[in-house]
């Protein structure tokens, strides 16, 4: 047993390991930023509301409908070799303790024991639907195995706008997941000797802790810079179709540039980065921002008999968007 994660990592990174097995064998560093800190705060607010009976987001109320016995922040471990699962504890803060090399730990935001359901909260950005989402499938599998369920409801709740997506996993779906997990494990083992030949870029790169050391990202950046430089000053002479193709490439480049920024930030978390000229260095600096808690203010206004919508303001602006032709 070990306190370190095995090559399968944790449940939240399972999609990336399935798509890009080489990334599991590169150096890595966690990415901490304002967005992730806010996401953690949103999760904690809902957790406290569930546990202590406070005001909850509508999507959380929906998830709890019909349930009187539930737990928050439940930690499990699934063994891909044996197919077994165990509950490690609750509210552990990702401190999973001793794990075997073939175990995958994960934390489930909400487990409804009397309705056989698991839920994961997301802040805003959409992810794959529950029955196609490795993290949610693993959560459903773990809870079902530990609690003896033949089927389990798996749900994602988006806290920013109270949208949700729900699916069901049957015992057959669980068998399929276990086969998938074993295939992922085999792929990761095969990538150990030559990680660079088992890399693949895609949406899963966004939060990859190995991005700063990834040769696939370096090669992609070099190719795209040359293509976009050729477009400078020529847009007016191009056909509309060529401009459309340039727009698609630009979007991909912007996504890549954002990932490079994150990689630089990860490196700067570990050491000062000297800038050209020798007079400045790039370094991480702790910052804070104070703002009103809109959620709390809306609750307070409602308590006072005021409609929070009276105090909303709409700002109009133009935005370049893709629409159906």
Say what each PLM segment does.
Residues 1-117, 144, 151, 165, ...:
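Metal-dependent nuclease catalytic cores that hydrolyze phosphodiester bonds in DNA/RNA
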Residues 27-29, 199-206, 312-315:
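Short coil/turn segments at secondary-structure boundaries
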Residues 27-28, 120-125, 237, 241-245:
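Glycine- and acidic
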Residues 29-35, 125-128, 193-198:
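Short, polar/flexible loop-turn hinges at active-site or ligand-entry regions and domain interfaces
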Residues 69-73, 163, 211-213, 217:
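Charged, terminal alpha-helix-loop-beta segments
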Residues 72-192, 313-314:
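Mg2+/Mn2+-dependent nuclease catalytic core
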Residues 84, 248-251, 255-325:
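Extended, charge-rich alpha-helical segments
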Residues 179-251:
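Short, charged, low-complexity amphipathic alpha-helix
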